[in-house]
Amino acid sequence: MIRIVDDIEEKQRITRSILTALPEWFGIPESTENYIRESANEIMVASFEEEKANGFLCLKETGKDTVELAVMGVLKTHHRKGIGRDMFDKAKRIAAEHSYSFIQVKTVQMGKYPEYDETNRFFLGLGFKEFELMPNLWDKWNPCQIYVMSL
């Protein structure tokens, strides 16, 4: 079941449980804590199986016309089951209902790490387009690829 999560403590609990289970993508403790903290003030869409979250994503406004897919995670045991796509479809509808024109997402550039190559292919498969590469936004080992989608 995919649903919106409004409760601040539940948002942070879900974010912590999913991100700490995905160290290949979220292995920097300070960054993970930042995602957990910021999730409290973002729109959260989560996937549940028997009342237990197995995935989530958060949307954050970055401009009056643009929302960012700020963070997303699906437990590895649930990868390739359509959960990420289903959550994104709901988030995309929510963004359109809030009159946003664009949705963006940032990830590590394709070709740097196998896990992030999977992430890049996922976003491209959803219909995102390459917008800009910012090689020094994070650090030289993690060049930031920005993808964008028109709503």
Which stretches of residues belong to each language-model region?
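Short amphipathic alpha-helix that is part of the acyltransferase structural core
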Residues: M1-E30, F48
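Conserved GNAT acetyl-CoA-binding A-motif
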Residues: A95-P114
